[in-house]
């Protein structure tokens, strides 16, 4: 297998994995964070949250009338802790947003841009050959081997007197078209699996209620007419 195909498959697989794990990425980024700010802020937030919970439990266990001074003192502590926790939440959000931006830049530089460069550089690379030039019409062969730009460039080349098929030495499917078909197939399979496996089943009662509402709506519209 040619290195171009291997590289293209690598980028497709990595991008799909990132797409499927998008809901967990923030937790992973925070867990393996190299930023000392997020680590220290998270520890401080956990410490103050535990302290707030302890004071709340203590206030619930005592009577405000019998232990008014202690109850009031705890309330003042809770108010102070709420302010500190709110400040920590704000600082944590800023730190996490900054780290997410760094991750997105890293993804752009290591995945998105290299994949785009590969498609632009090797977009016309023939992944596999077509037996003969007569297998498909000339325009279809042109699109398969040259990409979708073949169609808008066709009249321009015709007016300039350039043969649009002069570069098609061997008919085949180019990398750009192959990647388009591959990603479309993956998306279709993914959609079917979601619908068959992960889509919640609508109960008969819900269906019957929906039908009743539709009938009532039609009856109301008929009465209005």
UniProtKB/Swiss-Prot annotation:
GO cellular component: endoplasmic reticulum membrane; GET complex; Golgi membrane
GO biological process: one example: tail-anchored membrane protein insertion into ER membrane
The keyword Cytoplasm is annotated on this UniProt entry: no
Keywords: Coiled coil, Endoplasmic reticulum, ER-Golgi transport, Golgi apparatus, Membrane, Transmembrane, Transmembrane helix, Transport
Its biological purpose: Required for the post-translational delivery of tail-anchored (TA) proteins to the endoplasmic reticulum. Together with GET2, acts as a membrane receptor for soluble GET3, which recognizes and selectively binds the transmembrane domain of TA proteins in the cytosol. The GET complex cooperates with the HDEL receptor ERD2 to mediate the ATP-dependent retrieval of resident ER proteins that contain a C-terminal H-D-E-L retention signal from the Golgi to the ER.
Stated family: Belongs to the WRB/GET1 family.
Protein name: Golgi to ER traffic protein 1
Biological source species: Vanderwaltozyma polyspora (strain ATCC 22028 / DSM 70294 / BCRC 21397 / CBS 2163 / NBRC 10782 / NRRL Y-8283 / UCD 57-17) (Kluyveromyces polysporus)
Gene: GET1
């Amino acid at each position: 297998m040619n290195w171009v195909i291997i590289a293209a498959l690598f980028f497709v697989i990595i991008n799909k994995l990132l797409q499927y794990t998008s809901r967990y990425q923030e937790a992973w980024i925070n867990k393996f964070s190299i930023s000392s700010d997020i680590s220290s802020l998270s520890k401080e937030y956990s410490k103050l949250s535990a302290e707030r919970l302890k004071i709340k439990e203590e206030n619930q266990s005592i009577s405000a009338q019998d232990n008014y001074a202690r109850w009031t003192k705890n309330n003042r502590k809770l108010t102070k802790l709420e302010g500190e926790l709110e400040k920590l939440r704000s600082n944590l959000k800023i730190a996490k947003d900054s780290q997410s931006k760094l991750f997105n830049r890293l993804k752009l530089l290591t995945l998105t841009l290299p994949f785009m460069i590969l498609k632009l550089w090797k977009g016309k690379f023939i992944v596999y050959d077509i037996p003969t030039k007569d297998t498909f019409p000339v325009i279809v062969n042109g699109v398969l081997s040259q990409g979708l730009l073949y169609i808008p460039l066709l009249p321009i080349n015709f007016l300039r007197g350039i043969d649009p098929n002069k570069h098609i030495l061997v008919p085949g499917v180019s990398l750009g078209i192959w990647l388009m078909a591959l990603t479309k197939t993956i998306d279709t399979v993914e959609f079917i699996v979601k619908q068959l496996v992960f889509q919640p089943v609508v109960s008969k009662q819900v269906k019957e209620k929906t039908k009743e509402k539709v009938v009532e709506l039609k009856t109301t519209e008929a009465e209005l007419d």
